[in-house]
Swiss-Prot record:
Protein name: Gamma-glutamyl phosphate reductase
HAMAP family: ProA (MF_00412)
SUPFAM superfamilies per the UniProt record, alphabetical: ALDH-like
Function: Catalyzes the NADPH-dependent reduction of L-glutamate 5-phosphate into L-glutamate 5-semialdehyde and phosphate. The product spontaneously undergoes cyclization to form 1-pyrroline-5-carboxylate.
Organism: Escherichia coli O1:K1 / APEC
One biological process term in Gene Ontology: L-proline biosynthetic process
Amino acid sequence: MLEQMGIAAKQASYKLAQLSSREKNRVLEKIADELEAQSESILNANAQDVADARANGLSEAMLDRLALTPARLKGIADDVRQVCNLADPVGQVIDGGVLDSGLRLERRRVPLGVIGVIYEARPNVTVDVASLCLKTGNAVILRGGKETCRTNAATVAVIQDALKSCGLPAGAVQAIDNPDRALVSEMLRMDKYIDMLIPRGGAGLHKLCREQSTIPVITGGIGVCHIYVDESAEIAEALKVIVNAKTQRPSTCNTVETLLVNKNIADSFLPALSKQMAESGVTLHADAAALAQLQAGPAKVVAVKAEEYDDEFLSLDLNVKIVSDLDDAIAHIREHGTQHSDAILTRDMRNAQRFVNEVDSSAVYVNASTRFTDGGQFGLGAEVAVSTQKLHARGPMGLEALTTYKWIGIGDYTIRA
């Protein structure tokens, strides 16, 4: 089955690579319109997926990721339309010039070819990834989590109908609908057809891909994000940032999971934190230095377990640790961070600059929420993933991250001397 999908995707990629920006946008507009026109079938499929997932004990955080509503589906369709408005990087001349030999040389952006994406219970990813791949002239093979089988099947059927109505092959966007995990291992060895693989899931999936894949892999999406509250931070303003970073949408990978508090501000900061977190419904997981003081406040508090510093809660839970200074905070982030998004709240710009220079994450913030690490917020449009590695892309992966380049030399029957 996967062999045939690979063949179809590779053939489709050749046709997609020849499309003009106008032709690609016409396809995307058709997909957006059809997602809205056929919303009932997608929402019905999703309701069945959610019911099964709840019966099987899926966590509330994962159920939130899985669930579609009419408003969320309209938002997904609108995101596709936003991709239409983005500049098409394909065909862009990155640099070039005329060599001493007279050869005119340029470096031009081109599609990667076929992208493989493995992800969990995130039906929006199906459309986001498909739209970005189509905009950049790439075919895509999707493997969503078993919890989203019906939703993905309904969504991909709508996308394929839109492709065919525009004269393009359905093989441009395909989904593996068999939940058998053995197919993941088979997919990881499809280097004959897939040019780049993006796993969006937990640490176990990333480890599997790194160990078994014969395809270049871009990993990311695991967000153990930190905020360091420096001793010079403005408490009231800092709390606004922390509330946003923790509570706006707790199930996302750019949500803060650990708060590092400078010991010199702890006595005044912790009582205010407890009051604010109680109002926000957040459970605090406190270290020994913070526990007694937080227990005197209104927020729910438990003693932190050592392993929780490495946890991506994806829920209304927040670690709180007292640190001696900036060096201590940076050391903690280096040991427990996932190189996703980390922030410092401070009025000391020297400390801010040190934090920016010494924290090796894909996104580092000064006096701002970690929730900004998002393709839309960065002006990139919908994102295919957030890469936490350094090659071939880093941070939110927009359109340019789905391209490569080729060198083109134009001469007048020019030969090398």
